[in-house]
Swiss-Prot record:
Keywords associated with the record: ATP-binding, Coenzyme A biosynthesis, Cytoplasm, Kinase, Metal-binding, Nucleotide-binding, Potassium, Transferase
Pfam families registered for this protein in UniProt: Pan_kinase (PF03309)
The protein, known as: Type III pantothenate kinase
Subunit structure: Homodimer.
Pathway where it operates: Cofactor biosynthesis; coenzyme A biosynthesis; CoA from (R)-pantothenate: step 1/5
GO MF annotation, one: pantothenate kinase activity
Family affiliation: Belongs to the type III pantothenate kinase family.
Length: 249
């Protein structure tokens, strides 16, 4: 049974988990702000030496080199970097230029497809950006859409207004009866509405009983506002990175 450390270097956080050949467990995350190498070292302190360390990164080379230095210092283990390809794990990349597709989105659609290869899949990932991707039966990745996430929407509003409230807490009912609640409710419900519309536009008529997957750091907050049947899959990207690494040898 493999014992791999999987790293997802996203825009806001570094997510990690252990892959045992079947599922991801012992997951965690550290923010890029502050002393992230020290925080990661502490988070991994009790971990047994992994057989392999795998990373998918939306960042440039410097971040990957820093992660490899940590891996070599702690375990003497090199890093396997996963990148987007034209095809992998039975999925054909439908982008005109496959290199433009972020590796996190690629990993998520690969993981979704491998869970049910004969089904249509809609993958909604709500992090710094919100993405919606569609993959059809037999691994036909159709493409997707990108939309600002909760914090980006709030920041855009805050750049032109004063007293931006915290987005923490549950989504407030609308119509709101205070300006902070109106902003919070508008951002949260607005993003949920955009995602519902994108999902309905992107699934073709022949997509009967599609599987809907919800992942990303802010996805849990939006789940009650999205169509029923969306399955919360917080480790979908990590799972996909592990599957891509397994195929790469």
């Amino acid at each position: 049974m493999p014992h791999w450390l999987i790293l997802d270097a996203g825009n806001s956080r570094l997510k990690f988990g252990l892959w045992d050949g079947h599922r991801v467990h012992a997951t965690g995350a550290v923010s890029w702000s502050g002393d992230w190498p020290g925080e990661l070292d502490m988070a991994l302190a009790a971990m047994a030496r992994p057989e392999r360390v795998v990373v998918g990164s939306v960042h440039q080379t410097a971040t990957v080199e820093a992660l490899e230095a940590i891996s070599r210092r702690r375990w003497g283990c090199p890093l396997t970097r996963i990148t987007t390809t034209a095809a992998a794990c039975g999925v054909q990349n439908g982008y005109r230029d496959y290199r433009q597709l972020g590796v996190d989105r690629w990993a998520a659609v690969v993981a979704a497809h491998l869970r049910a290869p004969e089904a249509w899949h809609l993958v909604i990932d709500v992090g710094t950006a919100a993405t919606v991707d569609v993959v059809g039966p037999r691994g036909d990745y159709r493409g997707g859409a990108i939309f600002p996430g909760l914090r980006l929407l709030a920041d855009a509003l805050g750049s032109g207004t004063a007293g931006l409230p915290s987005l923490a807490g549950e989504a407030v009912p609308l119509p709101a009866r205070s300006t902070p609640d109106a902003i919070r409710g508008g951002v949260v419900h607005g993003l949920a509405g955009a995602l519902r519309h994108l999902a309905s536009e992107m699934l073709p008529a022949e997509a009967v009983r599609p599987r809907r997957w919800l992942t990303g750091g802010d996805a849990g907050r939006l789940q009650p506002l999205l169509p029923q049947g969306a399955v919360w899959a917080p480790d979908l990207v990590l799972e996909g990175l592990a599957q891509l690494a397994r195929e790469s040898g």
